[in-house]
UniProtKB/Swiss-Prot annotation:
Protein name according to UniProt: ATP synthase subunit c, chloroplastic
Function: F(1)F(0) ATP synthase produces ATP from ADP in the presence of a proton or sodium gradient. F-type ATPases consist of two structural domains, F(1) containing the extramembraneous catalytic core and F(0) containing the membrane proton channel, linked together by a central stalk and a peripheral stalk. During catalysis, ATP synthesis in the catalytic domain of F(1) is coupled via a rotary mechanism of the central stalk subunits to proton translocation. Key component of the F(0) channel; it plays a direct role in translocation across the membrane. A homomeric c-ring of between 10-14 subunits forms the central stalk rotor element with the F(1) delta and epsilon subunits.
The protein's assembly and partners: F-type ATPases have 2 components, F(1) - the catalytic core - and F(0) - the membrane proton channel. F(1) has five subunits: alpha(3), beta(3), gamma(1), delta(1), epsilon(1). F(0) has four main subunits: a(1), b(1), b'(1) and c(10-14). The alpha and beta chains form an alternating ring which encloses part of the gamma chain. F(1) is attached to F(0) by a central stalk formed by the gamma and epsilon chains, while a peripheral stalk is formed by the delta, b and b' chains.
Gene this chain is encoded by: atpH
Keywords: ATP synthesis, CF(0), Chloroplast, Hydrogen ion transport, Ion transport, Lipid-binding, Membrane, Plastid, Thylakoid, Transmembrane, Transmembrane helix, Transport
Transcription regulation recorded as keyword: no
Protein species of origin: Arabidopsis thaliana
Length: 81
């Protein structure tokens, strides 16, 4: 096994997880902040806002999980070796 390929795979795995976490992290923070603001403005719509928020947070978190899957594939099922 080429050590350069192994080192590049480890670096790519770290970048995959790190970069895949930035966007959803910012999006989740923004969505949660807007949900709290919406509930503060209209308390009677809390259930609807909360349900929509939880669904959107799940979709955003899926992006991070995809990055983790790519990183695990690079580390343990490396197609470049």
């Amino acid at each position: 096994m080429n050590p350069l390929v192994s080192a590049a795979s480890v670096i790519a795995a770290g970048l995959a997880v790190g970069l895949a976490s930035i966007g959803p992290g910012v999006g989740q923070g923004t969505a949660a902040g807007q949900a709290v603001e919406g509930i503060a403005r209209q308390p009677e719509a809390e259930g609807k806002i909360r349900g929509t928020l939880l669904l959107s947070l799940a979709f955003m978190e899926a992006l991070t999980i995809y990055g983790l899957v790519v990183a695990l594939a690079l580390l343990f099922a490396n197609p470049f070796v």
